[in-house]
Amino acid sequence: MQAKILTGNEAVAHAVCLSRVQVVPAYPITPQTTVVENLAKMKADGMFLGEFIEVESENTALAYCIGAAYAGARTFTATSSHGLAYVHELLHWAAGARLSMVLANANRALGAPWCIESDQTDSLAQRDTGWVQLYCSSVQEILDTVLLAFRVTAESKLPVLVVYDGFYLSHVHEPVLVPPQALVDSFLPPLPDKPAFKLELPRNHYGLANASFMARLVQRRFGA
């Protein structure tokens, strides 16, 4: 393990890079912006080897994720507040289609009145969209939970929302233990080239009910 001083948003970017994500559609919104800025820099520096796609809106970003997930790619995006509200319709589609993806959300209040302070209303309003929601309480938890989320989404066939407080965690520096790439690779094997999906019997309800069990199982494996 390598010790680093990271913000919550930097921890997300490091975890995405370590997870060998293949497609990242990106659109900035405060306080999430430095997630995609860090990934853009990692792409420019040759650290991130996946596709980094700059899009014109949060809605388009999630639409890209849906298309990439249909093709079997490991995919990720990030947003906050009104950006998450904007993609509400597509959240239902991603979950209903049983697509594997991870979305990081830096909690921020919804207007009106206009406010950029931390508030969980944005993610709580998406409770019934069918996404697994994982909430973080420290920068270390953010990095660990993003890694966990990619395993949970792959095994449960449901998209995962990783949630953390805007500014209080997204912009605060904390000491973080970053695992080596080889250790992450052993925990997150590549996705199969031909994902198995039983089209005639999606079992959406079973998948959602099984997701909490899968999350606990993956957490135990993560700590092993």
What spans do the regions from the language model cover?
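Conformationally flexible catalytic loops at phosphate/diphosphate-handling active centers
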Residues: 160-224
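Structural beta-strand/beta-sheet cores of well-ordered domains, especially the beta-sheet scaffolds
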Residues: 25, 99, 158-160, 204
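Thiamine diphosphate
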Residues: 1-125, 130, 139, 147, ...
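Conserved anion/nucleotide-ligand pocket segment
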Residues: 132-135, 140-178
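Short, contiguous, pocket-lining structural segments
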Residues: 8, 27, 31, 141, ...
